Amino acid sequence: MANLSDEDLLFLSNLMHIKEEGQFKNIWNKKNVDNKSSIGEMLENIDTDKLKDSDITYDGEISGSEWAAMIEKVKDNPQICNLKLVDMDIDDKKALSVCLHNDETGETYVVFRGTSAGEWPDNFEGGYKADTEQQRRALAFVERQNFDNITVVGHSKGGNKAKYTAILSDKVDRCVSFDGQGFSAAFYEKYGPLIEQNKSKINCYALDNDFVNILMSDVYENKTY
């Protein structure tokens, strides 16, 4: 089974920022789940020339020209384009989780979006609680998938959710976190043996000047700056 590279997973994480905005229509919707639409199909009608000329900064602090370059690269990657949207969860806090699956290769990816507007209180709770509501919801989303050998990925709070599920779910065999915050002392006290058992699944990437990934104590096998 071929797996997406960590660079490809960063593209998936960035695609989570697409919503009804500027040149974009929201691709993360029930219709695309019901149709099991592929990434390629969902990106097909995005006009990258218009994106290049767009003068607004999109969600995730991504410019139109940056989006255009990224989407063109994704469209040229059949391994990403063939992934189908098979499940999605968006709650009252606008937290988004998606499950993507390739029928031919058996690859499965769960991607968590970064902090939504309604999740800031949950971020603060993560500083002193072993488990937060949003972490438990992320774990429940992974556990309801009818697949094993799942790769989980996310940026910022999404990265924290990915690491949390990698520690606690046997369905997860790989985790890639981009600038994800760490965990509380209560988390380490409650899950010490599971952390030691499962941290080998986790690769972390962090910018030198990013403050989120240094919050609290992190969990990983490898960390790249």
Task: Please describe what each predicted stretch is.
Residues 3, 14, 26-35, 45, ...:
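Detector for Asparagine
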Residues 47-151, 168, 172-176, 183-185:
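A conserved cap/lid and substrate-binding interface adjacent to the catalytic center
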Residues 10, 98, 108, 202-203:
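A broad, low-specificity signal marking well-ordered, structured residues that form hydrophobic/aromatic
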Residues 1-56, 60:
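N-terminal low-complexity, Ser/Thr- and acidic-residue-enriched intrinsically disordered segments
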